């Protein structure tokens, strides 16, 4: 009887092994019921290598350099098991390494435009999929249009830039812009806004615009324009709505009243149009800078806008510019700050600003400390295409942060407040240049 039992168990084991597709008892990949294709063009950055291997509107089309590395990012709302493939073409003789978390593998090209990477276990949060060319025999490592994820979960829990409607691949690679709108008392004719801005160390990549003092018709802040150039920027939109400054009628053009030494003034376009001024200034992360600007009607149907800037330790304010906006009669409306990235090559790097001591001054000289803000975001943030943003109050300071694919639980349209700091600035407005 014992021999029959042993024979039955051995036969059963053999049949089970033969019943597996490979006949060796090795488990085949899971069958997944949901799949999404993440467009490379809107979700990938070149994180190493020469700029000749740029990402196009169709994804990775020319990958010629061995030291080029690409990173694609997406976010999952929970841990999951998945299968990952790349959609594109790859010569079978080429070797490309893929890294997700701590898992590193070699890609296997298929015959149906699919390059298999295998199965992965992902934790909740942002994922980085890195691709590194190792060896090749032809000019191009691969062409890749999409990253395909197969899962057994609800695909709505995966966040990424989904489409290129209204040029969203471009805006998505720039990253989510976020804003703080300050709560102000009703019934006051607000004239001045004062703010103190500091950028934490290593939070100032190229493409950053740390806007300090925004108003209904323009903005005032500091930029990182290149490795060698930084600017203090002050702009006022024309009342004529257009993206082309050349189309603005003469009676609706922004007029320069005065400007500071070494300040450039001209016109700007693309995101509205109007008058622009900037001072090339080597500001640095880790220091605090002061911004002061005014909005005042001239009683003749125009409004005058003036901006001043200085380091906190300095004694003299620098005049940036004074503009006159025709066909406008308003005091300072909608005071706000924002952080944005204007260069899509650097949307994978985090930037952050702190706003430490914002105040308003009304037309009668009354100072009002700003203690409450509302966090809002641009189209990319509101759609949930990019969720790497934060803002509100931290350590009794207002702050904004975006880019870099960090995990955040910030909620758009949420309110944050801080107690009064009672650090009113000492400014002699009569002595301003």
Stretches with model-predicted labels:
Residues 6-7, 18, 415, 430:
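Intrinsic disorder/low-complexity detector
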Residues 9-30:
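Bacterial Sec-dependent N-terminal signal peptides
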Residues 1-4:
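Positively charged n-region of N-terminal signal peptides that target proteins for export
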Residues 23-282, 292-297, 301-433:
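Extracytoplasmic
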């Amino acid at each position: 009887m014992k021999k029959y039992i042993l024979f039955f168990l051995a036969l059963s084991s053999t049949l089970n092994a033969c019943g597996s597709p490979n006949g060796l008892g090795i488990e085949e990949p899971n069958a997944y019921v949901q799949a999404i294709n993440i467009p490379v063009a809107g979700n990938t950055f070149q994180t190493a290598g020469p700029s000749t291997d740029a990402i196009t509107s169709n994804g990775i089309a020319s990958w010629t350099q061995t030291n080029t590395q690409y990173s694609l990012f997406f976010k999952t709302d929970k841990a999951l098991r998945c299968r990952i493939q790349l959609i594109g073409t790859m010569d079978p003789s080429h070797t490309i390494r893929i890294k997700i978390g701590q898992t590193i593998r070699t890609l296997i090209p298929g015959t149906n435009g699919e390059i298999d990477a295998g199965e992965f276990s992902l934790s909740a949060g942002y994922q980085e999929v890195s691709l590194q060319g190792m060896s090749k025999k032809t000019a191009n490592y691969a062409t890749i249009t999409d990253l395909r994820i197969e899962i057994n979960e609800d695909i709505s829990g995966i966040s990424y830039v989904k489409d290129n409607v209204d040029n969203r691949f471009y805006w998505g690679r720039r990253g989510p812009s976020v804003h703080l709108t300050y709560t102000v008392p009703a019934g006051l004719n607000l004239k001045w806004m004062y703010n103190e801005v500091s950028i934490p160390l290593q939070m100032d990549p190229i493409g950053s615009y740390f806007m300090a003092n925004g108003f209904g018709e323009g903005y005032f802040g500091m930029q990182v324009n290149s490795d060698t150039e930084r600017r203090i920027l002050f702009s006022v939109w024309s009342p004529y709505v257009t993206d082309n400054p050349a189309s603005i009628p003469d009676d609706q053009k922004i007029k320069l009243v005065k400007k500071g030494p070494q300040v450039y003034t001209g016109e700007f376009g693309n995101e509205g149009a109007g008058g622009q001024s900037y001072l090339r200034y080597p500001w640095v992360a880790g220091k605090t800078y002061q911004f002061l600007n005014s909005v005042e009607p001239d009683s003749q149907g125009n409004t005058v806008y003036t901006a001043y800037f200085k380091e906190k330790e300095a004694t003299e304010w620098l005049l940036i510019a004074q503009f006159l906006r025709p066909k406008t009669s308003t005091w300072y409306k909608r005071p706000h700050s924002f952080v944005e990235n204007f260069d899509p090559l650097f949307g994978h790097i985090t930037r952050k600003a702190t706003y430490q001591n914002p105040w308003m001054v009304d037309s009668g000289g009354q100072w009002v400390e700003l203690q409450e803000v509302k966090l809002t975001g641009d189209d990319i943030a509101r759609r949930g295409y990019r969720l790497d943003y934060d803002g509100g109050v931290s350590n009794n300071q207002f702050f904004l942060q975006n880019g870099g694919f960090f995990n955040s639980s910030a909620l758009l349209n949420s309110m944050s407040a801080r107690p009064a700091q009672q650090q009113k600035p000492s400014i002699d407005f009569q002595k301003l240049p």
